């Protein structure tokens, strides 16, 4: 379990994207990783590195919180296309075994997607969709690169995410996560790498600015706000 942390603009997301491109990770967004226009710079960045591995992860997935909307739209569009295809086959093919086979194949594809993502995959909240997607896509012995997964989640959902990650880590999964969440960073035994001034250094959770600022605010929000807004 490795966390990449740092201020906005520190380069942690760029590094994560470069790793994703370099290891040939699959993206869960609206585009494949190699065709995502927002990741062209990551492809160039990745070419400057030599990637080595001890073993080949069966699954390599890259997921940004903002990609979930595009992914669910893609699933919804695919479900609609399959429904249209099935209707067209019923209307154009003569009755018989051939039509039964053709429509059955399309219906099976649609049923598989529905079982995984529901009849209305974009009808859930962003946070619910994000967690449901992770539960479906995190399989044993995979390598997962998550960019700010806490973004659509309430604090209790962040804890649910941590529990899910812990469960999958016990199944041989490895995670590299770029985050601003002090809750996620507190995962026991995790390696925390701080991106600062163009360098990566290992850091302790209690020394991170994210933790110190949050702790100070929670200890006395009125005093903190009075000082800030004076």
Language-model segment annotations:
Residues 2, 13-144, 155, 203-230:
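Phosphate-coordinating catalytic segments in nucleotide- and nucleic-acid-processing enzymes
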Residues 147-149:
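Walker B catalytic acidic pair
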Residues 156-174, 181-230:
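C-terminal lobe/lid and adjacent interdomain/linker elements of RecA-like ASCE P-loop ATPase modules
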């Amino acid at each position: 379990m490795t966390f990449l942390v740092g201020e906005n603009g520190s380069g942690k997301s760029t590094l994560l994207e470069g790793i994703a491109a370099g290891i040939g990770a699959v993206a869960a967004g609206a585009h494949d990783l190699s065709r995502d226009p927002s990741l062209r710079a990551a492809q160039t960045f990745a070419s400057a590195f030599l990637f080595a591995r001890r073993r080949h992860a069966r699954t390599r997935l890259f997921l940004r919180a903002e990609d979930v909307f595009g992914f669910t739209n893609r699933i919804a569009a695919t479900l609609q296309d399959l429904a249209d295809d099935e209707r067209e086959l019923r209307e154009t093919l003569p009755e018989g075994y051939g039509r039964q086979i053709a429509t059955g194949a399309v219906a099976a594809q649609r049923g598989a997607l529905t079982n995984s993502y529901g009849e209305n995959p974009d009808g859930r909240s962003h946070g619910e969709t994000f967690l449901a997607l992770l539960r479906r896509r995190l399989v044993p012995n995979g390598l997962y690169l998550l960019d700010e997964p806490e973004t659509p989640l309430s604090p209790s959902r962040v804890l649910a995410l941590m529990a899910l990650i812990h469960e999958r880590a016990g199944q041989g999964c490895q995670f590299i996560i770029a985050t601003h969440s002090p809750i996620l960073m507190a995962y026991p035994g995790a390696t925390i790498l701080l991106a600062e001034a163009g360098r990566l250094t290992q850091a302790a959770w209690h020394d991170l600015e994210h933790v110190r600022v949050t702790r100070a605010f929670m200890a006395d929000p009125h005093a903190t706000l009075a000082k800030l807004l004076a």
